[in-house]
C-alpha cells in the first residue's frame, strides 16, 4: 500500500509543472485598434494555453473567453477607429507625425491614469508574474512597472520606433537603415542618406525633450518623485516582439532579445467552400 502511495506522489510531483500558469498583465492604453490587434492575438493565445491574462485597453471583448479579464478604458479618450485617412498618413510631414504622437502619448497616459477603473486597479496593487507593454509613443506607464518590480516585455505593432533601439543596444545605422518617419526606399540615394542621418540625430534630441521629459514628470506625479528616469527603467525590457518580417521589411540587424513576429495577429483562413469531390 505504501508503494502505491509513493508512486502516486512521485507521479503528481513530476507532472505538476504541466499545470503551472502565469498571471500576465498587458498594459495597452493606446486608442488605435490597428495597434491593439497584435496585443489581443498574443494575449488570447496565452489565455488559450491556460495563463491568467488581464488586459487593460480600450477594446474589451465582445465575446469573453476563459482566462482573459478585461479592464476597460472606454470613455477615457476618443477611440481612433476609422478616424485617420490613409492619404493623410501617406502624405504627412515627418515632423507633424512626430508632434502628433508626442501629444497623443502624453494625453493618453494622463487620461488613463486619471480614469476611475485604472485608479482602482492601481490601488488594488495586484501582483503579476509578467507585464506586457507597448513600445510606441510614451513610456509613462513604466512607472507602474517599476513600482511592481515585475519582469516585463514589450510589443511593437509597427516597425521599431527610432527611439526604441537605444534601450536594447540595437544597431541602427542611418547610412543604410531608413528612419521610420521618412518615406525613403530600400536603396537610398546619397541625398536621402544625408537627410536620413540628420533626421536620425535630430530625433534623438526631440524624443528626449518632447516625449521623454514630459512623460517622466507625469509618471513622477503618479508613482512618486523618487522614480528613476524612464529611460533607465526601459533598459530592463527583457524582450521586444516586433510586428515586422524580413521578407517584407528588408533584413536588418537585431540583437537576440528583439524578435520579428510579423503576422502574429493573422488567423488561419476559414474554409467557406464545400469540398470538391472527384467523380
For each feature predicted by the language model, list its residue ranges.
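N-terminal signal peptide
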Residues: 2, 10-29, 33, 45-48
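Classical protein tyrosine phosphatase
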Residues: 36-68, 139-164, 253
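Conserved catalytic-core segment of nucleotide-activated headgroup transferases in glycan assembly
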Residues: 38, 235-236, 248-279
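Active-site regions of enzymes building and remodeling cell-envelope glycoconjugates
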Residues: 65-76, 150, 255-264
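Conserved nucleotide-sugar donor-binding subdomain of glycosyltransferases
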Residues: 83-140, 187-231, 235-236
Amino acid at each position: 500500500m505504501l508503494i502505491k502511495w509513493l508512486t502516486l506522489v512521485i507521479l503528481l510531483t513530476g507532472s505538476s509543472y504541466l499545470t503551472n500558469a502565469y498571471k500576465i498583465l498587458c498594459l495597452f492604453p493606446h486608442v488605435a485598434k490597428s495597434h491593439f490587434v497584435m496585443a489581443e492575438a498574443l494575449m488570447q493565445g496565452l489565455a488559450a494555453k491556460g495563463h491568467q491574462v488581464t488586459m487593460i485597453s480600450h477594446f474589451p471583448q465582445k465575446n469573453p473567453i476563459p482566462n482573459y479579464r478585461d479592464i476597460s478604458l472606454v470613455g477615457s479618450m476618443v477611440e481612433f477607429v476609422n478616424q485617420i485617412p490613409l492619404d493623410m498618413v501617406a502624405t504627412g510631414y515627418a515632423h507633424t507625425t512626430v508632434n502628433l504622437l508626442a501629444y497623443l502619448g502624453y494625453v493618453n497616459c494622463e487620461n488613463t491614469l486619471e480614469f476611475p477603473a485604472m485608479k482602482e486597479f492601481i490601488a488594488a496593487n495586484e501582483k503579476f508574474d509578467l507585464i506586457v507593454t507597448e513600445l510606441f509613443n510614451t513610456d509613462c506607464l513604466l512607472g507602474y512597472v517599476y513600482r511592481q518590480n515585475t519582469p516585463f516585455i514589450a510589443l511593437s505593432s509597427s516597425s521599431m520606433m527610432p527611439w526604441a533601439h537605444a534601450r536594447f543596444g540595437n544597431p541602427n545605422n542611418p547610412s543604410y537603415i531608413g528612419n521610420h518617419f521618412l518615406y525613403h526606399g530600400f536603396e537610398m540615394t546619397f541625398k536621402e542618406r544625408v537627410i536620413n542621418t540628420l533626421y536620425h540625430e535630430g530625433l534623438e534630441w526631440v524624443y528626449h525633450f518632447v516625449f521623454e521629459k514630459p512623460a517622466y514628470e507625469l509618471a513622477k506625479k503618479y508613482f512618486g518623485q523618487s522614480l528613476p528616469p524612464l529611460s533607465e527603467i526601459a533598459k530592463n525590457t527583457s524582450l521586444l516582439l516586433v510586428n515586422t518580417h524580413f521578407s517584407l521589411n528588408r533584413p536588418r540587424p537585431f540583437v537576440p532579445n528583439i524578435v520579428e513576429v510579423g503576422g502574429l495577429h493573422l488567423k488561419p483562413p476559414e474554409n467557406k467552400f464545400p469540398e470538391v469531390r472527384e467523380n
